[in-house]
């Protein structure tokens, strides 16, 4: 069933434009509240309570107030955490035994975008069925709760402290970060007052950048999607590592002392190696269609099965649950360790990488010795709306030729964009010139 508002990661858009307007968000809070209330009544749980967290965008205040009004109008109690990473909201929702959690964030997008994302009582993303129920409720007229049945709202002061302690609890008790200097880039986002405490309290010397949010500078020149300042600061301070999070701190990028950047594909490999070195069985891991082939081949050579999900951490999570595995991720830095947290968490992922390095006594470069990422060439080709690339004869003929010639030493991925009339042509090969050659040949058939 197609949905009108919910995408693969909640509802997102430009602030002030539908659907990210205060009137719609109020109705959204009411609709979600009605669905939660019906569920609570059916299970005899009484009045539901939700947690609302947000990142540091200026529009967060406006949307928080609208959500609060909608939920309380539906008879739902509300707790508000203030700025808190998305995975922090997921954790507290589960830890406080709440009915649901809501995050106001547009992740790595600029400040003028925002979004709404829901978590279930278990800290997981809402099932499609529940999102569809909320959309159906949005189409109905609002019927407010009686005056004596309205919800109550209050702020909780210890949300950040609770989450800091939870993050630290995922780091092995017999390890510490004494003697390490770490640069942290919080993207002027939700981790700005969280991440420095986590790593400092575990013993590291911390240098913080991207930690002065003003409501309009989130992700602007800082964070996981713009690592140049992290690379510069890591070199300048002679740090052992640099860690970058995005605006809501659910993704991670890492820089070593030489300024080399490590993406999520490589970090997933590091986490698998750490488990195997500790004697833990790792039957398989999940990446995406975009995960570098070198990582897949390296894992398979060690007997670790590798499955590719559609792009998006939601789909990685689905595959992990289907196979009963624990570790997955994508190159953008969304990493999942399901025995540590129910959702992707940049801080916790960083701690797992650090634990691997401390336990082994190796650097990232040493752990990844022998894993040489294949060069990738990506070309975006504009096409007519509704274009079916699978029925394009010239493209299919060129595709057969390129796949035959690559013959296991590379791969081709062709997929349409989900947001614009574009077909993405990506070729991966051990030789960069070869990747470019085949990508250009394939793209030329569409031009």
UniProtKB/Swiss-Prot annotation:
The biological process GO terms on file are: carbohydrate metabolic process; peptidoglycan biosynthetic process; UDP-N-acetylglucosamine biosynthetic process
**Which EC class heads this enzyme's classification?**
isomerase
What does the PTM comment of the record read? Activated by phosphorylation.
Q: List the disulfide bonds.
A: none
Q: What is its EC number?
A: 5.4.2.10
Q: Which residues carry this modification: Phosphoserine?
A: 107
- Keywords, sorted A to Z: Isomerase, Magnesium, Metal-binding, Phosphoprotein
The protein's matches in NCBIfam families, at most eight in alphabetical order, are given as: glmM, PRK10887.1
- Stored PANTHER family: PHOSPHOGLUCOMUTASE (ALPHA-D-GLUCOSE-1,6-BISPHOSPHATE-DEPENDENT), PHOSPHOHEXOSE MUTASE
Mind telling me what this protein is named? Phosphoglucosamine mutase
């Amino acid at each position: 069933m197609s949905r009108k508002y919910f995408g693969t990661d909640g509802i997102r858009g430009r602030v002030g434009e539908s659907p990210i307007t205060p009137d719609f968000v109020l109705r959204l809070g009411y609709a979600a509240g009605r669905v939660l209330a019906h569920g609570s009544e059916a299970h005899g749980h009484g009045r539901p309570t939700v947690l609302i967290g947000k990142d540091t965008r200026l529009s967060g205040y406006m949307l928080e107030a609208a959500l609060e009004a909608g939920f309380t109008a539906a008879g739902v109690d509300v707790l508000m955490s203030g700025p808190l990473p998305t995975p922090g909201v997921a954790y507290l929702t589960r830890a406080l035994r709440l009915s649901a959690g809501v995050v106001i964030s547009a992740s790595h997008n600029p400040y003028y975008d925002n979004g709404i994302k829901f978590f279930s009582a278990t800290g997981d993303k809402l099932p499609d069925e529940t999102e569809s129920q909320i959309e159906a409720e949005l189409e109905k007229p609002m019927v407010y709760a009686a005056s004596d049945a309205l919800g109550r709202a209050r702020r909780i002061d210890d949300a950040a402290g609770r989450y800091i302690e939870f993050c630290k609890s995922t780091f092995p008790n017999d390890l510490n970060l004494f003697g390490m200097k770490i640069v942290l880039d919080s993207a002027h986002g939700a981790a700005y007052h969280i991440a420095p405490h986590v790593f400092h309290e575990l013993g590291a010397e911390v240098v913080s950048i991207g930690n002065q949010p003003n409501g309009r500078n989130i992700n602007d020149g800082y964070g996981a999607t713009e690592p140049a300042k992290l690379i510069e600061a890591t070199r300048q301070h002679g740090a052992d590592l640099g860690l970058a999070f995005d605006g809501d701190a659910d993704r991670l990028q890492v820089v070593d002392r030489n300024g080399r950047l490590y993406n999520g594909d490589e970090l997933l490999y590091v986490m698998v190696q750490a488990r195997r070195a500790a004697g833990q069985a790792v039957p398989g891991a999940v990446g995406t269609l975009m995960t570098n082939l070198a990582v897949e081949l390296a894992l398979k050579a060690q007997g670790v099965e590798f499955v590719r999900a559609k792009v998006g951490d939601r789909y990685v999570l689905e595959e992990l649950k289907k196979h009963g595995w624990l570790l997955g991720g994508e190159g953008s830095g969304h990493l999942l360790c399901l025995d540590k947290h129910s959702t992707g968490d940049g801080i916790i992922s960083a701690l797992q990488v650090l634990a691997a390095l401390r336990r082994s006594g190796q650097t990232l470069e040493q752990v990844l010795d022998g894993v040489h990422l294949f060069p990738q060439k990506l070309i975006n080709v504009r096409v007519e709306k509704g274009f079916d690339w699978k029925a394009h004869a010239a493209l299919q003929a060129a595709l057969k030729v390129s796949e035959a010639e690559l013959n296991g030493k590379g791969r081709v991925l062709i997929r349409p964009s989900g947001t614009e009339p574009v077909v993405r042509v990506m070729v991966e090969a051990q030789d960069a010139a070869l990747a470019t050659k085949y990508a250009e040949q394939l793209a030329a058939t569409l031009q």
